[in-house]
Amino acid sequence: MKERLQQLQQEALEKIEQANDLKALNDVRVAYLGKKGPITEVLRGMGALSPEERPIMGALVNDVREAIQQALEAKQATLEQAEVEKKLAAEAIDVTLPGRPIRRGNHHPLTRVIEEIEDLFIGMGYTIAEGPEVEQDYYNFEALNLPKGHPARDMQDSFYITEEILLRTHTSPVQARTMEKHQGRGPVKIICPGKVYRRDNDDATHSHQFTQIEGLVVDENIRMSDLKGTLREFARKMFGEDRDIRFRPSFFPFTEPSVEVDVSCFNCGGHGCNVCKGTGWIEILGAGMVHPNVLEMAGFDSKKYTGFAFGMGPERIAMLKYGIDDIRHFYQNDLRFLQQFNRV
């Protein structure tokens, strides 16, 4: 039996040394020290020994089991350390390598134009006013000199929710609400950026949803010359310092007189090209002097106060500024289109 124990010890130590991972090592542990292992069988056979031999053989079995256990623990520590070192090597970071570039987003071209226009007018002393996109018919039409049944309402089909509630068709209601809050006391000097909605068929130049920026100035002694000077400054900041503007008579129910505003073509310098369709001028916005009826409905004395208003579409400004030929590009989230403005 002593020879058998020494043989088991030698076999176990050899297999422990040969184990190359923790699973193989655990298999050796179970094979030699488990309940069905050979050392347990030796212990069960000690009943056939004489009383004098039992203590000697028991001590020998314990020595063999202790030797195998110590070898197992030492090998386990070695394998665990090797596994940690292997994992660390796989996860090692060379801090001298250049970093991986992080792809960053960029402002949408419409956001760029809107913020540029806002900054321009804020620098001229204007404040930004906002209002609801779901608007009352009164502020969208009636407070702007468009009573129910007025033929000018046919100029823009609207998204009505109820007879008195609709999606605003322009940002002019913000002007009406702001003047109302001033309770007939000037000055008022605001721009109103925001989304508007009209029942247009989407194509290269039309959309059922788009953005507008409208401006309003109300105070004593406001003249058409103030409007022209303001818009000339706007055109030169947006399209170049050598730009000029011209007014063409037009009609809007909420201004009188009303004008369409053209800017001299920034592509050809006014000589005529495909951008300006050979005219040398490009239409960019509508404007006019605030109609006395609009002032009176907002609580202002039209004999004391005058004002001017203007409205533009950032989409059109952006299309002209960046040479974009289809308004739908702004709303399709095509990364090939949007990524071009990283360089702008």
From Swiss-Prot:
Class in the EC hierarchy, top level: ligase
CDD domains the UniProt entry points to: PheRS_alpha_core
UniProt: Mg(2+) binding residues: E256
Keywords: Aminoacyl-tRNA synthetase, ATP-binding, Cytoplasm, Ligase, Magnesium, Metal-binding, Nucleotide-binding, Protein biosynthesis
Catalysed conversion reaction: tRNA(Phe) + L-phenylalanine + ATP = L-phenylalanyl-tRNA(Phe) + AMP + diphosphate + H(+)
A GO term for molecular function: phenylalanine-tRNA ligase activity
Cross-referenced SUPFAM superfamilies: Class II aaRS and biotin synthetases, tRNA-binding arm
GO cellular component: cytoplasm
Entry EC number(s): 6.1.1.20
GO terms (BP aspect): phenylalanyl-tRNA aminoacylation
Subcellular location: Cytoplasm
Record has Aminoacyl-tRNA synthetase as a keyword: yes
Free-text comment on the cofactor: Binds 2 magnesium ions per tetramer.
Cofactor requirement: Mg(2+)
Subunit architecture: Tetramer of two alpha and two beta subunits.
HAMAP family: Phe_tRNA_synth_alpha1
Family the UniProt entry places it in: Belongs to the class-II aminoacyl-tRNA synthetase family. Phe-tRNA synthetase alpha subunit type 1 subfamily.
Protein name: Phenylalanine--tRNA ligase alpha subunit
